[in-house]
C-alpha cells in the first residue's frame, strides 16, 4: 500500500491559518477530490472539524479521523487513536493508496517517522 501525503502549500510554506485553508481555489479543491476519491483518507480531528459541516464526512472516501479523545465520535467516520493504527486499518481493508490530508501535526508525525511514499503538493 502506498502512503501518500496531499497538501496545498503557500509560497511562504504555510499550509493553513487558524485551522482553515489559506485560500479556497476551485481547481485545487477539484484536484484534491479527484486524487483522493474512492480511497481512505487520514486526518486529524481539528483538521476534520475545520471542514464545513455540509461536506463532512468527505463523500466516496473512507474518512479516518485521528484523535486522542477516547469519547470522540463522528457519524460516517472511522476513529483511530494513532497514525500507525489508522494506516494499519487502511491496509487491512486492502487499500492501495491511503492519503494523509492534514493537519500540520499529522503531516509532521508522518514525515518524522519516514512513513510517506508519495507527496502531492500544490
Language-model features: locations:
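Extreme N-terminal starter segment of soluble prokaryotic enzymes
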Residues: 1-5
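Short beta-strand/turn micro-motifs composed of small residues
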Residues: 7-9, 43, 67, 102
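Zinc-dependent deaminase
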Residues: 9-10, 26
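C-terminal boundary of histidine-terminating zinc-finger modules
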Residues: 13
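Short gly/ser/thr-rich secondary-structure transition/capping motifs
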Residues: 21-26, 101-102
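Short, surface-exposed acidic-centric catalytic microdomains
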Residues: 22, 31, 36-81
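A glycine-rich beta-strand to alpha-helix segment
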Residues: 50, 72-74, 78-122
